[in-house]
Design a protein with these regions (language model features):
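Structural micro-motif
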Residues: 1-5
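Non-catalytic, surface beta->alpha helical segment in thiol-disulfide oxidoreductase systems
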Residues: 6-41
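Intrinsically disordered, low-complexity, compositionally biased regions/tails
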Residues: 22, 47-49, 169
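Flexible inter-domain linker/hinge segments
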Residues: 40-76
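Non-transmembrane, aqueous-exposed alpha-helical and coiled segments at domain scale
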Residues: 61-230
Length: 230
């Protein structure tokens, strides 16, 4: 991108950015500067100010907040099949947790990415905010859903609730989340009609995110610790 600087006594006093000859003339005081060139050219700008590149630039040049391991998927490999093959899915399609998406998800909370939210049964694995964000991306959550997912995980990962027992029993047991208050209205969650989530993204994905954390972080997979027959 054309950039002209005016320097006096070793210090910059003015600059002209972009392809616009009148600005060049004003800066230099030279009439007809570049007269053999077009007066202006549209779309001449730095990609660093392109709004569509914000997430990519934050990932590449911002402070690295992510500690999770990275997994490369080859160009010839279907990423959906790759995630399912690695056991990250509950059987339904999932959203690839790219660095950009996980960073965007973390914008939904002010809690540090490395804060331990809970020790997740049945394998009793410490789970950070970042790990919850990864699974929220997989589930299809929006960033504004993350606080509810975090609260739900804290609610079930304690001795009183006994999530380990829920996951290890042979009976067909599954937790139900009840969300109420201003955040329920802010997220547009179903209430009164369709409370079991059909067609509502918040209702569908918040519970799914919790289930994926229990599965992917806590290790509760059918046929392993999860012995439910229904």
């Amino acid at each position: 991108m054309p950039t002209l600087l005016r320097v006096e006594q070793g210090a910059e006093v003015a600059r002209a950015i972009g392809w616009h000859r009148p600005d060049w003339e004003d800066l230099t005081g030279i009439d007809g500067l570049g007269s053999d060139l077009p007066e202006s050219r549209p779309g001449c700008g730095s990609l660093s100010v392109d709004p569509s590149r914000e997430s990519e630039l934050r990932r590449r040049f911002g402070q690295d907040r992510l500690r999770s391991r990275r997994i490369e998927v080859s160009a010839l490999e279907d990423e959906q099949e790759a995630m399912i093959a690695r056991g990250w899915s509950d059987g339904y399609p999932v959203v690839a947790p790219t660095e950009e998406r996980v960073l965007a998800m973390l914008e939904g909370t002010e809690r540090p990415a490395d804060e331990i939210v809970a020790v997740v049964p049945p394998d009793l694995v410490p789970c950070s905010v970042e790990k919850v964000a990864v699974n929220a991306v997989l589930a299809g959550c929006k960033p504004e859903y993350l606080p509810v997912v975090l609260a739900a995980l804290e609610a079930v990962c304690n001795d009183t609730f006994n999530m380990h027992g829920v996951q290890a029993t042979t009976l067909g047991i599954s937790p139900i989340l009840i969300v109420n208050g201003p955040i329920r209205r802010a997220l547009g969650m179903n209430a009164g009609v369709g409370v079991l989530a059909p067609g509502n993204r918040a209702n569908d994905t918040i519970g799914r995110a919790l289930q994926l954390v229990i599965r992917n972080v806590g290790g509760s997979r059918p046929g392993e610790v999860d012995r439910s027959t229904f």
